[in-house]
Curated annotation (Swiss-Prot):
Any one GO BP annotation for this protein: base-excision repair
Full protein name: Probable endonuclease 4
Family in the record: Belongs to the AP endonuclease 2 family.
Gene this protein is translated from: nfo
Keyword Protein transport belongs to the record: no
Top-level enzyme category: hydrolase
Record-linked SUPFAM superfamilies: Xylose isomerase-like
Gene Ontology terms, MF aspect: deoxyribonuclease IV (phage-T4-induced) activity; DNA binding; DNA-(apurinic or apyrimidinic site) endonuclease activity; phosphoric diester hydrolase activity; zinc ion binding
InterPro entries per record: AP_endonuc_2, AP_endonuc_F2_Zn_BS, Xyl_isomerase-like_sf, Xyl_isomerase-like_TIM-brl
UniProt KW keywords: DNA damage, DNA repair, Endonuclease, Hydrolase, Metal-binding, Nuclease, Zinc
Binding site for Zn(2+) 2: E153, D187, H224, E269
Its biological purpose: Endonuclease IV plays a role in DNA repair. It cleaves phosphodiester bonds at apurinic or apyrimidinic (AP) sites, generating a 3'-hydroxyl group and a 5'-terminal sugar phosphate.
């Protein structure tokens, strides 16, 4: 199984808009000074995906060449629930996952990021096992060894969501890794909301040590950069601009400098849009 190597240089960007065409997300990334981006490859709030055309693929490839952006990440749709207890929703999710991954391969995207799932009326244990099956069923798409990694995003621990603890993510990875290339996208707001104190370099040291012991740092492939409106451990997923929330700017400076995290692709999801992202990218590059 081919495993995409990590980038050789630090990459920083944001979740940009694909309005008017997927390629436009790449051009917006260039305009804000990014070296990578995240985007939705389809409407994130609908089950039905439009089919990629050869023209769409060619436009995207041209934009990749013209912008020199790399390690592009697709964020899968919000309706997906890989661990859904409802058979109908589970089947819809698996179809959508398959289409999402196939499109990412066609476009030459490096990462596809999924929320691991929600147990809803069922146990988290059963949800975790269904999610493992869902992701493992994507194996046929990887028989040609495409340079794509499926990422499981850390969650804030709200409701019945799985993936808020490193232990749950480790369980998922152990069940999936023999079938498809898999890793973790660490969302700073989410892990802070889930109780991991990353508001200081000392806190990060403990969290990274714990991550390495439970999952392994080799599985940490990308980071969502978001400050948090709410204090530590509140299980609330509310993003704030960098340095304007309860995590604080010191935490993000650490990520930009520490050798374990410096070169990991990082994607801003902060509220404020392109003008804010331009300022945040400049700031983070300055402190790196």
């Amino acid at each position: 199984m081919f495993v995409l190597p990590p980038p050789q240089e630090p990459l920083l960007g944001a979740h940009t808009s694909a309005a008017g065409g997927l390629h436009n997300a790449l051009y917006e990334g260039r305009d804000i000074g990014a070296t990578t981006i995240q985007l939705f490859t389809a409407n994130q709030r609908q089950w039905k995906r439009r089919s990629l055309t050869q023209n769409m693929i060619e436009q995207f490839q041209t934009a990749l060449d013209e912008t020199s952006l790399s390690y592009i990440m697709s964020h899968a749709g919000y309706l997906n629930n890989p661990g859904a207890p409802n058979p109908e929703i589970l089947e819809k999710t698996r179809i959508c996952m398959y289409q999402e991954i196939a499109d990412c391969i066609a476009l030459g995207i490096s990462f596809v990021n999924f929320h691991p799932g929600a147990a809803l009326s069922d146990s988290k244990e059963s949800c975790l096992d269904r999610a493992i099956t869902s992701f493992s069923q994507m194996a046929p798409l990887f028989e040609t060894n495409p340079p794509l990694v499926v990422l499981l995003e850390t969650t804030a621990g709200q409701g019945s969501l799985i993936g808020s603890s490193f232990e749950e993510l480790a369980y998922l990875i152990q069940g999936i890794k023999a079938h498809i290339p898999v890793g973790v996208c660490l969302d700073t707001c989410h892990i802070f909301a889930a109780g991991y104190d990353i508001s200081s370099p000392e806190g990060w040291e403990q969290v990274l040590k714990h991550f390495d012991e439970v999952i392994g740092l080799s599985f940490l492939r990308a980071i969502h950069l978001n400050d948090s409106i709410f204090p530590l451990g509140k299980n609330k997923d509310r993003h704030a601009p960098i340095g304007e929330g309860c995590i604080g700017s010191e935490s993000f400076c650490f990520l930009m400098r520490d050798e374990r995290t410096r070169k990991l692709p990082k994607y801003l999801e902060t509220p404020g849009g392109p003008d804010l992202w331009t300022k945040e990218i400049r700031y983070l590059q300055k402190v790196s």
